[in-house]
UniProtKB/Swiss-Prot annotation:
Record note on domains: Consists of 3 domains; the N-terminus binds the ribosome, the middle domain has PPIase activity, while the C-terminus has intrinsic chaperone activity on its own.
Listed Pfam families: FKBP_C, Trigger_C, Trigger_N
GO CC term, one of those recorded: cytoplasm
SUPFAM superfamilies given in the database record: FKBP-like, Triger factor/SurA peptide-binding domain-like, Trigger factor ribosome-binding domain
InterPro entries tied to this protein: PPIase_dom_sf, PPIase_FKBP_dom, Trig_fac, Trigger_fac_C, Trigger_fac_C_sf, Trigger_fac_ribosome-bd_bac, Trigger_fac_ribosome-bd_sf, Trigger_fact/SurA_dom_sf
EC number(s) given by UniProt: 5.2.1.8
GO molecular function ontology, one term from the record: peptidyl-prolyl cis-trans isomerase activity
Segments forming domain PPIase FKBP-type: 165-250
Domain of life: Bacteria
Predominant location category: cytoplasm
Name of the molecule in the record: Trigger factor
Any single biological process term in GO: 'de novo' cotranslational protein folding
Function in brief: Involved in protein export. Acts as a chaperone by maintaining the newly synthesized protein in an open conformation. Functions as a peptidyl-prolyl cis-trans isomerase.
Length: 451
C-alpha cells in the first residue's frame, strides 16, 4: 500500500492511496468462504457450497465487500498516521476518488475532525441589553384585557343585535354551485364575533343579526385558503342564529385578582399588578431578544469566534440546504437544474456561505451548552411539538411520528438548545437592576393565564 496523508488544518485532513489489484483479489477467497457458510443453494448442504460456485454467483457482492474492506484498511492506516481515533472524527470520511487502473486502485478521501473551539471572546460578542420596564399604562391595559378575558358570557334580551365580542350560537351550511361541500356545515356552533375564528367576511355578515333570525349571503374563499378545494371558490352560506350572549363586565379589583390568581392564597389587586408587570417584562424581553438581539449575537459569534471548520460537514449542510430549496422551487426551475449539471452545481454552490455559517454557529452553541451545562430533555421536545400540533390543528402523535421518521427530532432539540444558550448569554448581560427584576419575576409571571 502506498499511502500519503496530509493534515490541512486542525479540522481537516486528506488522504491519497494506491493499492495493487492483488490487494483486492487476495480478499476474495476469505469473503467467499463467509458467504458460503450462510447461503443455501439447491443441491448442496449449507456450508458445503463450492467456492467456485459462490464466486460466480455472488461475484458483485464479493467485489463490493472486498472494496469496502480495502477502504477501511486504508482509513485505519491513515488514522494511525494522523494519530487520531474514531472519537476524533466528525461525520464519516468523504470518499472523493475510487478509481481502478490497470495494475492498481487509486483512493482519495477527505477526513473531518472535531474542531477546537476557544470561547475566550464570548463576552465581546454579547450586545448590550436593556429591556423596557412596563409602565402604569401598559399594566392597566393588560388588567383591562384580563377583566375581559375572564368575564362570563350571559344571555341577552331578544332585541339585542349581534356585535363584535358577542358569543353567538348558530347553525350554518355552505353551498358551491348549489351543492353542499365538505366541512361547510355545523349545528349549534359557538362563535365569538371578531375573534377571526371564521373568515372575516363570514363574521361581518352576522353583525346586526338577532336571535331567531335566518340569513343567506355570498362569500368568496381567499385564493390562498388552506383547503385547496375551496380556494378562490364562490359560496352561498345559510345561517340561523339561535342565541346571543354578551360578556358580563368584571371590575378591576381584588375580586378579579382572586379569579385570575385562583391558586394564590390571599390574592389582591396589588399582587395581580406585580404579576402582570412581571409577565409584561418577560414579554418585552422575549420580543427584544427574538426580533433583534439574538440575531445580532449570532452575527458577532460568527465574526469573532475563529476556528477551523470540517469541510465534510459544510458539504453535507450544502446538500441539505440545496435539497430543501428544491421543494420550494417552481417545476420549471427544478427541471432546468435536472437538465444542466452545471446549473445544479452552481445553485448548490450558492448555499456555501449559509452552510458555513450554520455549521460554525452549531459548533459554537454546542460548545457553550456543554460549558454552561445547558440542555433540553426529550420530553421538552415532545411538549414543543405537541404545542405546535395544537396551534396548527394537527394530531400531536402523528406530528411527532412524522418528525421521528424524517430524523428531525435532533434538529428540534438543537434549535431549542440554541435558543436557551443565546437567552442565557443575553440575560447575563442585562443591567444588574434588571437581572434582579428578572430573578424576582420569572417564577411568578407564568401564573397569569388567559381566561
Amino acid at each position: 500500500m502506498n499511502l500519503e496523508v496530509k493534515k490541512i488544518d486542525t479540522a481537516n485532513a486528506r488522504l491519497s492511496a494506491k493499492l495493487s489489484i492483488e490487494n483486492l483479489e487476495k480478499r476474495y477467497d476469505k469473503i467467499a468462504q463467509k458467504i458460503a457458510q450462510k447461503v443455501k443453494i439447491d443441491g448442496f448442504r449449507r456450508g458445503k457450497v463450492p467456492l467456485s460456485l459462490v464466486k460466480t454467483r455472488y461475484q458483485a457482492q464479493i467485489e463490493q465487500d472486498a472494496q469496502e474492506e480495502m477502504i477501511q484498511e486504508v482509513l485505519k492506516n491513515a488514522f494511525k498516521e494522523l494519530g487520531i481515533e474514531n472519537k476524533d472524527l466528525i461525520g464519516s470520511p468523504n470518499l472523493t476518488k475510487f478509481e481502478k487502473k490497470d495494475t492498481h486502485f487509486e483512493i482519495e478521501a477527505d477526513i473531518g475532525l472535531k474542531p477546537t473551539i476557544v470561547l475566550d471572546k464570548i463576552k465581546e460578542c454579547v450586545p448590550s441589553v436593556g429591556v423596557e420596564i412596563p409602565n402604569e399604562e401598559k399594566i392597566n391595559e393588560r388588567l383591562k384585557q384580563l377583566a375581559k378575558d375572564y368575564a362570563k358570557f350571559v344571555d341577552t334580551d331578544a332585541q339585542r343585535k349581534a356585535q363584535n365580542d358577542d358569543k353567538l350560537t348558530i347553525d350554518f351550511e355552505g353551498f358551491i354551485d348549489n351543492a353542499p361541500f365538505e366541512g361547510g356545515k355545523a349545528e349549534n356552533f359557538n362563535l365569538i364575533l371578531g375573534s377571526k375564528q371564521m373568515l372575516e367576511d363570514f363574521e361581518k355578515a352576522l353583525l346586526g343579526m338577532q336571535a331567531g333570525e335566518e340569513k343567506e349571503f355570498p362569500l368568496t374563499f381567499p385564493s390562498g385558503y388552506h383547503a385547496e378545494h375551496l380556494a378562490g371558490k364562490e359560496a352561498l352560506f345559510k345561517v340561523k342564529l339561535h342565541q346571543i350572549q354578551a360578556r358580563e363586565a368584571l371590575e378591576i379589583n381584588d375580586e378579579l385578582a382572586k379569579i385570575v390568581l385562583a391558586n394564590e392564597e390571599n390574592a389582591t389587586l396589588k399582587l395581580l399588578k406585580e404579576r402582570v408587570e412581571g409577565q409584561l417584562f418577560l414579554e418585552n424581553k422575549a420580543r427584544l431578544y427574538n426580533e433583534e438581539l439574538k440575531e445580532k449575537l449570532i452575527e458577532n459569534l460568527d465574526e469573532k469566534i475563529v476556528f477551523d471548520l470540517p469541510k465534510t460537514i459544510i458539504e453535507q449542510e450544502m446538500d441539505l440546504l440545496f435539497r430543501n430549496a428544491l421543494y420550494s422551487m417552481q417545476a420549471e426551475e427544478v427541471k432546468s437544474l435536472q437538465e444542466s449539471q452545471e446549473k445544479a452545481k452552481e445553485k448548490r454552490e450558492s448555499f456555501r456561505n449559509d452552510a458555513t455559517k450554520s455549521v460554525k454557529i452549531t459548533f459554537i452553541i454546542d460548545a457553550l451548552a456543554k460549558e454552561e451545562k445547558i440542555g433540553v430533555h426529550d420530553n421538552e421536545v415532545f411538549q414543543t411539538l405537541y404545542y405546535e400540533a395544537m396551534m396548527t390543528g394537527q394530531n400531536p402523535e402523528n406530528l411527532i411520528e412524522q418528525y421521528r421518521k424524517n430524523n428531525m427530532l435532533a434538529a428540534v432539540k438543537m434549535a431549542m438548545i440554541e435558543d436557551r444558550v443565546l437567552a442565557y448569554l443575553l440575560d447575563k448581560n442585562l443591567p444588574k437592576e434588571q437581572q434582579e427584576i428578572l430573578e424576582k419575576m420569572r417564577p411568578n409571571a407564568q401564573k397569569i393565564q388567559a381566561g
